[in-house]
Amino acid sequence: MDEKQIEMASLIGEGSTWQAGKWLNKPSHCRVDDHTLELVTDFQTDFWRETHYGFIRDSGHFLGFKTRGGFTAQVRINADFRELYDQAGIMVRLNEETWLKAGIEYNDGMPMISSVLTQGKSDWAPGCFSGDPTDFWLRVTVSDGVLRLQYSTDGITWPLLRLAPFPDADSYTVGPMCCTPERQGLRVSFSEWLLSPPLGRDLHDLS
């Protein structure tokens, strides 16, 4: 294991990892309990840039962990999505103009599996979710200028959700994310957080 892998592997321990993160827009109510990060969203929080709506919002809750180059990050999310645009999942961020957020987002009366890739302006790619939206997993890998986003309904099988170009950089910030653009009070629980060097698995390897 080289120096980079040792440094990354040292971030894997759940309890120490939450404390090592740095908040962007820390929520008023949050706590760590038995390796679980629990929080309640503040009023009208969101991440979005320009497309369709014309506004820029950078007020969502994000607990970021800095990496050295490429990485794989994985987290389990529990939340009860009920109102329009309620959302929780994972975020990868280079700066306020370059980022990805992904997770469950409540839209048109149902929870959708969703991703937003922002490079100057945001896109939005929602889709139907066949699992239990109150309990799901996300995994994101960034390596050699490519971002691979996966989700899981059981923590075992990981279908591809998105494959996209993403800037090659010396470091990224990645971690749990949640927002409630239309309200406050969404309770979210994050657990089983893992951060490691890129897994390097074949694109069609769903393990």
Positions of the model-derived regions?
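Extracellular glycan-recognition regions
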Residues: 1-207
